[in-house]
């Protein structure tokens, strides 16, 4: 067989021009990801996304955010303790407070390659896409979306707090450490 002619710059594997013009740069492997959130409280949907991220990246930093303009059920330290108790068996996962600054800046400070976000549906994507674009613009950090497990597409921290506050059983949707916290235990 005849050797293939060299590929022209901007050409696809078949030699035709790429629809993107010049061939896109090959991305370096992503090693450290941030799973950000307020996690007030952490629920099993969050845990499932964190566990999947731990299978995709060498390191995952669960960044616990705090906005001074918001009221939280649990302090940052309480949220961190509940998350650590839940994810302690996952290799390569660390939990850190993020503070009130930009997520993009936090990613730059810790050398993160990616932000991992779970999506429950289209509304989540509409909310997350502009933030992902801004984070990429500010630091070049890519956002990786993981679709939520079907068991948890209806679960949110706000709904957990509301249902629990009205006496409903949320044990199926939160880790044991969170249930103890919601019930007033440590």
Could you tell me what each predicted segment is?
Residues 24-186:
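Nucleotidyltransferase catalytic core that binds NTPs
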Residues 1-26:
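Compositionally biased, low-complexity flexible segments
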